[in-house]
From Swiss-Prot:
Species annotation: Fervidobacterium nodosum (strain ATCC 35602 / DSM 5306 / Rt17-B1)
Protein's name in the database: Small ribosomal subunit protein uS11
Annotated signal peptide: none
Role noted for this protein: Located on the platform of the 30S subunit, it bridges several disparate RNA helices of the 16S rRNA. Forms part of the Shine-Dalgarno cleft in the 70S ribosome.
Self-association and partners: Part of the 30S ribosomal subunit. Interacts with proteins S7 and S18. Binds to IF-3.
GO biological process: translation
Keywords assigned: Ribonucleoprotein, Ribosomal protein, RNA-binding, rRNA-binding
């Protein structure tokens, strides 16, 4: 008779850094927030989709707020107190995510906007007609 397999959930490690980097990628359809150590290894992440939203609601400021709150709680749990914020993209969740990180008790050292700007790169999609 086969024995039942037991599954073990992965425990989050407490990282020995007190400073982290929060990357916020905010598009019109979603907001993805990643917490990394200064070398770039991802410690925690969340998005509008992982917080339970589907479709166009993933791109709302409220979805970004919930995602930022989850990442901030993980950061505090790991012992991270100070963060740098790098923001990419034109979406609606940029400001809300930064405010939520501050409200959760993280000290923001600096905010950098790293939105990629093309030097006349790809041709944009044709204009939408409704």
């Amino acid at each position: 008779m086969a024995k039942g397999r037991t599954t073990r959930t992965k425990q989050k490690k407490r990282v020995a850094v007190d400073h982290g980097v929060v990357h916020i990628k905010s598009t019109y359809n979603n907001t993805i927030i990643s917490l990394t150590d200064p070398t770039g290894h991802v410690l925690s992440w969340a998005s509008g989709g992982t917080t339970g939203f589907e479709g166009t609601r993933k791109g709302t400021p409220y979805a970004a707020q919930l995602a930022a709150d989850k990442v901030a709680k993980d950061a505090v749990k790991m012992g991270i107190k100070r963060v740098d914020v790098i923001v990419k993209g034109p979406g609606a969740g940029r400001e809300t995510a930064i405010r939520t990180l501050q409200a959760a008790g993280l000290e923001i050292d600096n905010i950098r906007d790293a939105t990629p700007i093309p030097f006349n790169g790809c041709r944009p999609p044709k204009r939408r007609r409704v």
